[in-house]
Amino acid sequence: MSEVISIRVRRGLKKELEELGINYAEAVRKFLEELVARERRRRALERARALREELRKKGAFPPSAELIREDRDEASR
């Protein structure tokens, strides 16, 4: 099922789009789909960063220096 979204554009823009053979309906559809995908990724990244920070505060992640020291100690053996 689909929905209808209507927009107003400056005078003459629709005519220019038609003269240039631009399928504006398809272009707007594609833009809106990309906009939704971008926003979903942005929000997922925001949630992941917040979760990582929360876990870091609870001590779930050792400090980077400790991890580097462990790697170097193992490599020198």
Swiss-Prot record:
Top-level taxon in the UniProt lineage: Archaea
Coiled-coil ranges per UniProt: 10-60
InterPro entries: VapB3-like (IPR039709)
Keywords: Coiled coil, Toxin-antitoxin system
Function: Antitoxin component of a type II toxin-antitoxin (TA) system.
Subunit structure: Forms a complex with putative toxin VapC3, possibly VapB(2)-VapC(2).
Name of the protein: Putative antitoxin VapB3
Lineage, top ranks: Archaea, Thermoproteota, Thermoprotei, Thermoproteales, Thermoproteaceae
